[in-house]
Regions:
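Catalytic phosphate/nucleotide-handling subdomain of diverse soluble enzymes
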Residues: 64-142
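Phosphate-rich cofactor/ligand-interacting catalytic cores and adjacent structured alpha/beta frameworks
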Residues: 1-70, 76, 125, 129-142
Length: 142
């Protein structure tokens, strides 16, 4: 569930903070919890209001302390829907390509390859001359 993903992301951030270098910065783990609170507070108000508050309170910049909680918040707001997540993350502004990439990857991992429109994957494979399915299978078998 998206709830479980948020919990695991929080736990991973707590672990990372426990072993990482102690630098003066906001806590990614606490900001993940804040992202979740923001989304829950805005469930009835729509994605636009949710994005406004995520950006306003967390930021949407390239620094991990902003991009990770923001992208996870968008993932949670759209319940892992790849198309909605990509659109929302990019429309959040600031470092749109970073956040779109992070959120898109989280949503894609959660929802699976079949959640991507075939016209998207076909074009990417055609334009890049890459068949990603064997590469993905090889990565999974490592």
């Amino acid at each position: 569930t998206p709830e479980a993903v948020m919990q695991l992301a929080y736990e991973g951030a707590v672990y990372g903070e426990s072993i990482g270098a102690d630098i003066p910065s906001a806590s990614v783990s606490k900001r993940i919890l804040l992202a979740k609170e923001i989304v829950n507070r805005n469930r009835t108000r729509g994605i636009s209001d949710t994005l406004d508050e995520l950006v306003g309170l967390l930021g949407a910049g390239m620094q991990a302390v902003e991009s990770i909680p923001f992208s996870l918040g968008v993932f949670y707001a759209v319940s892992g829907d790849v198309q909605k997540g990509l659109l929302a993350a990019v429309n959040g502004g600031d470092d749109a390509d970073t956040n779109g990439s992070i959120c898109g990857n989280i949503c894609g991992a959660f929802s699976g390859v079949n959640a991507l429109p075939k016209r998207w994957t076909s074009r990417i494979e055609r334009e890049n001359r890459i068949d990603f399915l064997p590469i993905a299978k090889q990565l999974l078998n490592r």
